[in-house]
Amino acid sequence: MILFALDLAGNRIYIENAHAGTAYLCEECGTRLMAKNKGSERQHHYAHVPDEKNRGIQRDCKWRSDLRTENQMSEWHRSWQERYPENQREVVFKKGDRIFRADVFLPERREVIEFQHSRITSEDFHARNEFYNSLGYSVIWLFDFDELEGRYQYIHPDQYDDFVQRFVRDGQKVYAMDQDTYRSTFGDWKAKSKKVHVCFMRTYNQWRFYSYIKVVTGSFKYDMPMHLFVIEMKERDFLSRIGINNGYR
């Protein structure tokens, strides 16, 4: 779903600020867009104006857009993005024939923020990290772990075995996640890169808890749970870390 476009002067225009009948251009493929922001049943968005000459280009662009739509459509995802200025949302990056659209880009920090509510493949997770890192940007992910209920569990300190006891550090909490769930999302990532940071949010009795994954242990050779050693962050500290000051931009 396309929420931003360029006017003929090169200005980025959010869909809610677009005018019917005005010419807009797609940031990704450069072809014409029309604003669809008059209805109330669907989320407002831009759509490509059919162009026979550029049909293949538009088809590929729509395919990329459709891949993003499931995540964008969630109220959870939109509520996070809307905390940032419009010029920092849905920022398009191109390198060679590769095109990615960041949920949020903080140029002063050289950081990309990705909000992940729906499931993501490990291939997509690694592709985005590799792409943004190749441009010199760090990536901070926030995953909605409420969507993984039943696939991971908190380990109380009284239940630490010898293995966990060897790795846990003061101030850390430990979660176990079944290996299939972990690998399908993160692949072989184990929190070793200084340019890829993964946080997750979970809700309990309407309270939000934020955790930063510090260390991941477990062997992919054996069918055993992965252990996530995390630092829990106060909400204010977490919001500051992703560029939201005092809870608001």
Regions found by a protein language model. Give the residues of each.
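Surface-exposed charge patches
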Residues: 24, 82, 130
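Active-site metal-binding core of divalent-cation-utilizing nuclease and nuclease-like domains
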Residues: 15-18, 77-112, 117-124, 153-155, ...
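Short aromatic-centered micro-motifs
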Residues: 26, 104, 168
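Basic, amphipathic alpha-helical patches used to engage nucleic acids or provide basic targeting signals
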Residues: 116, 120-148
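Non-catalytic C-terminal interaction segments of nucleic acid-processing enzymes
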Residues: 3-14, 18, 151, 156-249
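N-terminal cysteine/histidine-rich coordination modules
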Residues: 1-79
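Short, surface-exposed basic-aromatic patches at helix termini and helix-loop junctions that form
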Residues: 106-108, 129-136, 159-160
